[in-house]
Amino acid sequence: MNHRGSIPELTPARRAASSFVLSAGFSLTGAATVMLGVLLPVLSQRWTLSDETAGLLLFLQFLGSALGAVCTGLHRVRSLIIGYGLLALSMSAIAFSTARAPFAAFLFYGLGLGMAMTATSLLITDRSGDESAAKLEALNFIWSVGATAGPMLFLPFLHRADVRSLFLVLLCLFLLLLAWVALAERQAPRRTQTHDARTARTGTARALLPLVILAMCAVGVEAAMSGWLTTYSHRAGLRSLAGAALATSLFWFGEMLSRLAFSTRLLAQIGRRATLHATICGVLVSLVALVSVPSPSAILVVAAIAGICIGPLYPLLLSFMLEHSARGWIFAVGGVGAAIFPWLTGALSSHFHSLRFGLMAPCAAGLIMALLQTIAAWRDHVAAPAAPIPSR
């Protein structure tokens, strides 16, 4: 029986409607996250941006996203309202900008994305109880659907060079989601942690640090690929924007497929650690191939393979990190990498006058991940008890 002041339970119909709308909004944030990377060739021409300045736009968006994850409070619905409100305001500023790039608007755009995505994830987790892991896997897949479909859905606006209409469509969708959250959503009761669980998590900072670095690098690679693949493909010989955007779509399609595959029993059969080792190796190999063979057809193939390899990586690392802490900063650490590596890619590209050299930044992130995994495997081998020597 609910005591006075407790939060009323949602009816099954309301819960289903809420899950549907929140999932649709989460998928929209997937498309909105990759939007800047897909539009970057057009926006660079419109606002006369160098690669370094274009990288700064990506940096501001993902920095805002990381800050949004940190700023997401315990009241998930209020954070959702603020997030979608910021998205609507920043999108209107971007839509009506003229000769100069609205740098501040992209920072607040990322802030809104970070708050909306993190609050949705935590609200679904609060409502799911013991099924929270499965729900998070489903949410990651839904987000990937939006990220995959986004580049193709943006193409009609790119063909007409009418990006303002795209921004206005997104503005209307964000306003609809804002209205739903403000009028229909209710805060869910949070699961409490026992003192023993908090104490156990406090003592695992040493185990958490490598996971944090891995998450920063994994999301940094994902953001750099998403942000620069269209531009890289365009310069490598895919002259039409449709063909260039196809590389980004193939990357997200590969990621979506792998997340779908690993949301089944496949992950349990292979094992989390074995999957982690294999995907990190695959990411590094595909990144090296991307800069080694910059032909249009090779880029399309490698983009799909890179997406397949990187797809399960962040959800897998997130599952390891959530065993130690379930706070919003866990979602923010990936955003730090997502802010740094796309910007660093643009800065290196401007310095060396070659985007191939710029893509050494995500290659370095892949190398860091491989080295960390090698060290972890060596430590596990050393810590393992020696097998008994059989007597003659």
Describe every region a protein language model picked out.
Residues 36-37, 206-249, 253-256:
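Extracytoplasmic gate region of multi-pass secondary transporters
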Residues 43-44, 75-76, 153-161, 233-234, ...:
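Interfacial helix-cap and linker-helix signal at transmembrane-aqueous boundaries
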Residues 66-78, 158, 258-271:
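Helix-to-loop junctions at the C-terminal end of transmembrane segments
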Residues 66-98:
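Conserved MFS/SLC helix-loop-helix module at the cytosolic interface between two early adjacent transmembrane helices
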Residues 115-128, 311-324:
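Intracellular juxtamembrane helix-capping segments at the cytosolic ends
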Residues 165-183, 359-375:
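Symmetry-related core transmembrane helices of the 12-TM Major Facilitator Superfamily/SLC fold
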Residues 273-317:
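C-terminal transmembrane helical hairpin of 12-TM major facilitator-type secondary transporters
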Residues 324-355, 361-362:
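A late C-terminal transmembrane helix in Major Facilitator Superfamily
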